[in-house]
Amino acid sequence: MSLRHSTQLIVQTVKLGLPTARKACSLPIQNPVVAANRFFASSVHSRNPQEEDVIPPKENASREDATDSEAYVRSDWDNTPIPELEKETAEKAASERQHSEKVTINDKTSPPSVDEM
């Protein structure tokens, strides 16, 4: 590249507001995937809340599948009081603990040794 050509290139970049060759050399090369992710992230965050689609409640949700963190969400669409949901969750956890205590591992018998085979 000739000196004249590089000077023209620098003048064009300055006119366009792009970084000059000296600045461009000091900038790290940007990964195109990272650039795309930043673009989409900025476009997602710029949406207005009024444009958001309302998510309807799940029709097939059951109380057995609820966790503590889901209690507040379910209370919004299920009209169930939050203390009642927390009580159900505690009862479910207690019954699971009792069930796991009933299951015992039989470690009294060990596998046969090589000599026994």
Swiss-Prot record:
Task: Please list where the region (Disordered) is annotated.
Answer: 44-117
Q: Where is the composition biased (Basic and acidic residues)?
A: 60-77, 84-105
Q: Per the record, GO CC terms?
A: cytosol; nucleus
Compositional bias (Polar residues) = 106-117
Taxonomy, superkingdom: Eukaryota
Record's protein name: Uncharacterized protein C16A11.15c
